[in-house]
Amino acid sequence: MNKQISKKPAQRTIALNKKALHDYYVEQRFEAGLVLEGWEVKSIRAGRVQLRDSYVVFKGGEAWLIGAHLSPLPNVAEYMKADPQRSRKLLLNKREIGKLFGAVQKQGLTVVPLDLHWHKNHVKVEIVLAKGKKTHDKRETIKRREWEREKHRVLKSHG
């Protein structure tokens, strides 16, 4: 009668920012909540989200997600002004905001969203403290990835 309960809650990914992994070295990860309107949650459920050119800025001691595109559904009420590119407040502890803000100011790092996912019944965004890659670093990453693929291909055919 003892049922084992999974310790790790299921996280369903809604949107990924693959470009962030290509353009930045990930230093540290944080999970933040989002302040959303009702139509935005419906759009997220429908998968109409894009994080490609989004980033995080700090204004007045708060963190804001800029550039995330949430396309409104066609049946959004006409009296609502649905702005797909609006700034969305991130819900973080003061300690986390201070740590991120300090790293951005002192070390010149960037804060970008990596993915949007469901945690229980809430939409969360995984933001990362990141350092920009140079062009030659990107090329090196691509070469390494292609070499790994080739290695696996050769081992698979001979094994």
Swiss-Prot record:
GO cellular component assignments: cytosol
NCBIfam families the UniProt entry points to: PRK05422.1, smpB
Gene Ontology MF annotations: RNA binding
Family to which the UniProt record says this protein belongs: Belongs to the SmpB family.
Compartments, record wording: Cytoplasm
Keyword annotations of the record: Cytoplasm, RNA-binding
Name by which UniProt lists this protein: SsrA-binding protein
Function: Required for rescue of stalled ribosomes mediated by trans-translation. Binds to transfer-messenger RNA (tmRNA), required for stable association of tmRNA with ribosomes. tmRNA and SmpB together mimic tRNA shape, replacing the anticodon stem-loop with SmpB. tmRNA is encoded by the ssrA gene; the 2 termini fold to resemble tRNA(Ala) and it encodes a 'tag peptide', a short internal open reading frame. During trans-translation Ala-aminoacylated tmRNA acts like a tRNA, entering the A-site of stalled ribosomes, displacing the stalled mRNA.
GO biological process terms, semicolon-separated: trans-translation
Entry-linked CDD domains: SmpB
Record Pfam families: SmpB (PF01668)
Annotated Gene3D superfamilies: 2.40.280.10
InterPro entries given in the database record: SmpB (IPR023620), SsrA-bd_prot (IPR000037), SsrA-bd_prot_CS (IPR020081)
